Structure formats: C-alpha cells, structure tokens
C-alpha cells in the first residue's frame, strides 16, 4: 500500500507506529488508540514509552494528535464559548459527552508524548477527528498549553499540513490558494483568538459565522 501510494505521489497514513515506520509510512493518526488489531498502543494509562516518540521523530513522520476530549478544558478556560452557536452543530449526544467530561482530567502524559515527538523531529499537524468547528481551536490551544508557541501551533494548522499533503496552500502569498479567517485579536499573542472568527473568505466569497452556521453560505451565489 505504501509503495503504491508513493508511486502515485500520495502520502500514506495509518494508526500504526512500528510497522508503519519500518515500511515507510508518512504519518500516524491519533495520540491515543491502537492499530485496531489489539496491539501497538501509543499510550497506556496516560503514558507512552520513549521508543514511540523516538521512532516517530527519527522517521520524521507526521502525527495528528486529535485531542477532541480536551474541548472541555478549552470551554472551562473560555466559558463564553459554551454558548457559541457553532457548538450547536454538534449532535446533542456529543455535546453532552464533551460538557460532562472530567473537570480535571490529567493530560500530562499526552502533552509529553506530543512534545517529545515534536522535539524529536516529528511534524505535528492539527486535526480533530470531530465534526464541529470549535474542536480545531481547542486543538491549537492544547498545543500551546503543551509547550508550542502560538506561531508553531498556527503552522500546525496551515503550512505544515499543506506541505505534508502537497497542497499549494497553507500560506498567504501570490499564486497560493487561500481561504482566510478574519478574527478579532492576535493569535500570535493569544492562540484562543483563532476562535473569535468574524468573517471567512472562501473560494473568493465572504461569509459571516452566522452564514456558515445557518447554512446560508451554501445558497450564496459564486
């Protein structure tokens, strides 16, 4: 599979660690979880072995942590977001699950694994594995909480994944493809500002958050 993907010029990703690195896989998904074949967990009881971060880093693989459960921490730090209309896009069961998460869950092991991979040479890219739009902002906040600078966290959601996926995007420059979020605040000083979206420019069209949440955006003529 890896050889075929690479022959097509496509990066390959999976849930694996050791077999993936050995076979030349480009990326690994999720900071927790297994290969789904009952072995090769990245973390056990909130901790990971050093060889996990060493192998991923030495192979210069990309890792997408998908820290969706930490949305509770994000909402605790920024309580005004609990009434954000974008949360209404979540299915009720998922919203209830997130809002009833443990108030003081210990993510120190998760933080150590993410930063160990990053410092060992791995590339961290922001992804959520969750449908709602708030999760990405929570993901970026987690990276800063773990030790990244806001600039590094922003790159994890823009230039780094664009480079990994070989997309002509991820930066604002002549000739590049770019959807642009207009936010209130300076994310380079406070990463939570990324959640203060006021307008979005996508495919040359400008939308408000209300347009996107209500579904009006899909009816807007090109």
Annotate each language-model stretch with its function:
Residues 1-26, 69-72, 108:
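Divalent metal-binding pocket/active-site signature
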Residues 2, 17-18, 53, 114, ...:
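Generic hydrophobic/aromatic pocket-lining and core-packing "Φ" positions
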Residues 6-9, 24, 57-62, 119-123, ...:
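Loop/turn elements at helix/coil->beta-strand transitions in domains of secreted/extracellular proteins
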Residues 34-146, 155, 217-222:
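Active-site neighborhoods of metal-dependent hydrolases
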Residues 134, 145, 149-154, 162-197:
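Acidic, glycine-enriched loop/beta-strand segments at the rims
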Residues 27-38, 150, 200:
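Short hydrophobic/aromatic-enriched beta-strand-loop microsegments
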């Amino acid at each position: 599979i890896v050889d075929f993907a690479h022959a097509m010029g496509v990066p390959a990703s999976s849930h694996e660690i050791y077999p993936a690195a050995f076979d030349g896989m480009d990326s690994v998904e999720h900071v927790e979880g297994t290969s789904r074949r009952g072995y090769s967990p990245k973390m056990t009881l909130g901790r990971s072995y050093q060889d996990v971060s060493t192998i991923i880093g030495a192979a210069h693989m990309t890792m997408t942590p998908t820290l969706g459960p930490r949305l509770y921490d994000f909402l605790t730090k920024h309580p005004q977001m609990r009434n954000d209309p974008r949360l209404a896009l979540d299915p009720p069961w998922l919203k209830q699950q997130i809002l009833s998460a443990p108030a003081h869950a210990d993510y120190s092991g998760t933080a150590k694994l993410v930063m160990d991979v990053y410092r060992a040479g791995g590339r961290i890219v922001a992804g959520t594995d969750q449908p709602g739009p708030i999760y990405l902002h929570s993901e970026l906040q987690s990276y800063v909480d773990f030790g990244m600078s806001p600039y590094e966290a922003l790159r994890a959601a823009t230039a780094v994944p664009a480079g990994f996926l070989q997309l002509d995007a991820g930066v604002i420059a002549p000739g590049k493809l770019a959807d642009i979020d207009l936010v209130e605040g300076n994310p380079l000083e406070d990463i939570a500002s990324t959640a203060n979206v006021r307008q979005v420019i996508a495919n040359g069209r400008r939308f408000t958050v209300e347009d996107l949440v209500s579904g009006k955006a899909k009816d807007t003529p090109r």
